[in-house]
UniProtKB/Swiss-Prot annotation:
Disulfide bonds: none annotated. Heterotetramer of one alpha, one beta, one delta and one gamma chain. This is Pyruvate synthase subunit PorA. It catalyses: 2 oxidized [2Fe-2S]-[ferredoxin] + pyruvate + CoA = 2 reduced [2Fe-2S]-[ferredoxin] + acetyl-CoA + CO2 + H(+). The gene is porA. One of its GO terms (molecular function) is pyruvate synthase activity. InterPro entries: PFOR_II (IPR033412), Pyruvate:ferred/Flavod_OxRd (IPR050722), Pyruvate_synthase_PorA (IPR053390), Pyrv_Fd/Flavodoxin_OxRdtase_N (IPR002880), THDP-binding (IPR029061), Transketo_C/PFOR_II (IPR009014).
């Protein structure tokens, strides 16, 4: 069990860089974009100082960054990159190739709004737009979870029952540029926890030639999609197991790995959300509890694979369900999380709240407004919270 560690007061991007170093990655592909730039800068510093023995590839675009990771991962290397917003959008083509080739790349996404208008602040539109790309998506609440989740991501992605890439998503500026105390485990402990990555399907060996990424003709393409879907389903158990194993090694865990339940016992009103806003929600819940009001939170940690079974079980007794979305499905007037929740909880009142787009502050009073609205609403509805009149 872990007995020695170091505590540093660092930003979310530094926590991500520390995690990549602890994972002893072989290849880093780097292209700067706000607000993730300080992550790849910190990794460049680690490599230059000899703290990390990795190939650091400076590329000309995010499309090239993912292409480099794909090429490296196809040789059997453990790879890492980071991006945000328009950079993630530029990667779109290559994201599908990474998952289709079953390459366990790990990427930190510093969630940032998409242009236009140009906006460097936080919402979830960038990663949510890639939810169907075959990548596992984990959304973190704080900087400690950022470090821990990136370490966990390699254990999940490299599992032979999964072999899919993972995005670890943290809120831009709210986490990326905010300092918090983060416990840094010993490198040798992390490397023992992760083990050596020895892929059987992706390698470069002249004595064992293989073909990777060939043409998928109609006779086989559909089966490859089904295989990815089956791997996503298997990933649910792997995510749970890795979360438990991580807790045994490092004394920290995050719900059951897929979701975190907070004050759900006997809660008739439950808020559902992802990311750093959950910290604000927990504060409001604690304050309301002092007043005798019982409200719960279901934090969705893994948006892909989506934890349908957990949602159904944990919300079976709730009658007022408020889903907060930092994204909007334009033309449907709901966020992606709200759409998912409504499709699962067909016989319950599920109201959707669009919040925090482009970095708009989500205040304590906004959370209270949401609670009051969902309790009075007669049926499903969508409300934009904090919108200027």
């Amino acid at each position: 069990m872990e007995t020695m560690c170091e505590v540093k007061v660092i930003t979310g991007t530094s926590a991500a860089a520390e995690a990549a170093k602890l994972a002893d990655v072989d290849v880093i592909a780097a292209y700067p974009i706000t607000p993730q730039t300080t992550c790849v800068e910190k990794l460049a510093e680690f490599v230059a100082n000899g703290e990390l023995d990795a190939e650091y590839i400076k590329v000309e675009s995010e499309h090239s960054a993912m292409s480099a990771c794909i090429g490296a991962a196809a040789t059997g290397a453990r790879t890492f990159t980071a991006t945000a917003s328009q950079g993630l959008a530029l990667m779109h083509e290559m994201l599908f190739i990474a998952s289709g080739m079953r390459l366990p790349i790990v990427m930190m996404v510093a969630n940032r709004a998409l242009s236009a208008p140009i906006n460097i602040w936080n919402d979830h539109q960038d990663s949510i737009a890639e939810r169907d790309s075959g990548w596992i998506q984990i959304y973190v609440e704080d900087n400690q979870e950022t470090l821990d989740s990136i370490i966990q991501a390699y254990k999940i992605a490299e599992n032979e029952d999964v072999l899919l890439p993972v995005m670890v998503c943290l809120d831009g500026f709210i986490l990326t540029h905010t300092v918090e105390p983060v416990t840094i485990p010993k490198a040798e402990r992390v490397r023992e926890f992760l083990g050596v990555y020895e892929p059987k399907h992706a390698y470069l060996d002249p004595d064992r030639p293989i073909t990777q990424g060939p043409v998928g003709v109609p006779d086989c393409y559909m089966e490859t999609r089904k295989q990815i879907e089956e791997a996503m389903e298997r990933a649910k158990k792997v995510i749970r197991d890795v979360n438990e194993e991580f807790a045994e090694w490092f004394k920290r865990k995050y719900g059951n790995g897929l979701v975190e339940a907070y004050n759900l016992d006997n809660a008739d009103t439950v808020l559902v959300a992802m990311g750093s806003v959950c910290g604000t929600i927990k504060y409001v819940i604690d304050e309301l509890k002092k007043e005798g009001k019982n409200v719960g939170l279901l934090r969705i940690r893994a948006f892909r694979p989506f934890p349908k079974e957990d949602v159904k079980e944990l919300l079976k007794d709730a009658n007022n369900i408020a889903v907060l979305d930092k994204n909007i499905s334009l033309g449907f007037n709901k966020g992606a999380l709200g759409i998912e929740m409504a499709s699962i909880l067909k016989n319950k009142k599920v109201c959707n709240y669009i919040v925090g787009l482009g970095g708009r502050d989500i205040k304590i009073d906004d959370i209270k407004t949401i609670i009051n609205h969902v309790e009075k609403a007669e049926d499903d509805s969508t409300l934009w919270v904090g919108l200027k009149e």
